[in-house]
Swiss-Prot record:
NCBIfam families: Erm23S_rRNA_broad, erm_B_23S_MT
GO molecular function list: 23S rRNA (adenine(2085)-N(6))-dimethyltransferase activity; RNA binding; rRNA (adenine-N6,N6-)-dimethyltransferase activity
Role description: This protein produces a dimethylation of the adenine residue at position 2085 in 23S rRNA, resulting in reduced affinity between ribosomes and macrolide-lincosamide-streptogramin B antibiotics.
GN (gene name): ermB
Name this protein carries in UniProt: rRNA adenine N-6-methyltransferase
Gene Ontology CC terms, in alphabetical order: cytosol
Upper taxonomic lineage: Bacteria, Bacillati, Bacillota, Bacilli, Lactobacillales
Top-rank lineage group of the source organism: Bacteria
Top-rank EC class of the record's enzyme: transferase
Family: Belongs to the class I-like SAM-binding methyltransferase superfamily. rRNA adenine N(6)-methyltransferase family.
Length: 245
């Protein structure tokens, strides 16, 4: 493996595993797909067999040149040599996103594809522990993501599926976009609210009486078991108390 690869990656090379992943993506021949990380082009090739068009973004020069040579005759594939964190997804076109992403960039990339793209469905291969953190509504990331997408696990991918073999297991997850739970005009207030909420800085958000009213309205008996829906209710109370609604 080239030691100069920009972002340390673990590659999927097993035909069996790649086919299992493709099956889970439920792609159609009319789909346009943006792939994060071309790698060696194994998944790219399979995506292009089904989809109408695949645009694959790869930062590493060695991998880009390698995959460019491999895929140069494939008219359904467009390769882009760029950092995915700097890439601008289209605003009007309908598309899906697929990616086997570097573990250490998982948070940055998932925020990028959720908040800076209009993809209807997003499929990512991530570290299993990271997937669990995306579901945790006691964390900032979980509370932000849930406003835009629902998240589900599609496939478990043991460490043995990758080369080089990582120290952790991975999962294929699907993020399905839904109507936002927080309108744009309230987004900055929501991010502020979440930053204080997860750190339990309730006094920065409410007076003592307001806090009790918000808890009562949301039917919260125990803050350790609060649900996402209850947090949204508490946020709406925060807006009301501050004359924003």
């Amino acid at each position: 493996m080239n030691k100069n690869i920009k972002y340390s990656q673990n590659f999927l090379t097993s035909e069996k595993v790649l086919n299992q992943i493709i099956k889970q993506l439920n792609l159609k021949e009319t789909d346009t797909v943006y792939e994060i990380g071309t790698g060696k082009g194994h998944l790219t090739t399979k995506l292009a067999k089904i989809s109408k068009q695949v645009t694959s973004i790869e930062l590493d020069s060695h991998l880009f040149n390698l995959s460019s040579e491999k895929l140069k005759l494939n008219i359904r594939v467009t390769l882009i040599h760029q950092d995915i964190l700097q890439f601008q997804f289209p605003n009007k076109q309908r598309y899906k996103i697929v990616g086997n992403i570097p573990y250490h960039l998982s948070t940055q990339i998932i925020k990028k594809v959720v908040f800076e793209s209009h993809a209807s469905d997003i499929y990512l291969i991530v570290e299993e522990g990271f997937y669990k953190r995306t579901l945790d509504i006691h964390r900032t990331l979980g509370l932000l993501l849930h406003t835009q997408v629902s998240i589900q696990q599609l496939l478990k991918l043991p460490a043995e599926c990758f080369h080089p073999k990582p120290k952790v297991n991975s999962v294929l997850i699907k993020l399905t976009r839904h109507t936002t739970d927080v309108p744009d005009k309230y987004w900055k207030l929501y991010t502020y609210f979440v930053s204080k909420w997860v750190n339990r800085e309730y006094r920065q958000l409410f007076t003592k009486n307001q806090f009790h009213q918000a808890m009562k309205h949301a039917k919260v008996n125990n803050l350790s078991t609060v649900t996402y829906e209850q947090v949204l209710s508490i946020f709406n109370s925060y807006l009301l108390f501050n004359g924003r609604k």
